Amino acid sequence: MPRDQHRSAVYAAEDQLRSTLEAGGRVDFFGSTLDVPAERHFADLVSIQAYVDSVLRLAPVQERWPDVGPVLVRERAGSSRAHYEPGSGGVIAIPLTGLPGQRWAARETVVLHEVAHHLVWSADDPAHGPRFCGALIRLYQHAISPSAALLLRAGLDSAGVPLTGAEVAA
């Protein structure tokens, strides 16, 4: 796998947007007012799996990635990070330590990050490269809102992360 040189920048852009999505509401974006929904939080693996399944059934997702199959969501030991396992059809591992409502990874942006890995995973591409970022923007656009996708794209662009145009198109 090629060097994942934009990983930190991608995480920083997501973290910056996450604080906006935590509460949702109106955001001033270069003189325009954007309405941004509050981010979804999940209670358990069943609700995360149902959300992932619904995202993979979205028409724009199926049109762009018609050959992508389902992905299994499982609990990850520990609490430090979520991750995607590409073998055996794909597995998303989410840590659920802590009380419901306080589980940092049981949230929409973390889950969509891992779904983006599932959609574009390739040993020939960096894990957080342009194809991944384009897929993540598309997921934000169709699963959260076009405003959230615009804010993510601006954050990635500001961080110098290259994007693949075909992946980002609506």
Locations of regions flagged by a protein language model:
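Walker B catalytic acidic pair
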Residues: 114
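Active-site-proximal or metal-binding-adjacent scaffold patches in catalytic folds
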Residues: 1-109, 118-170
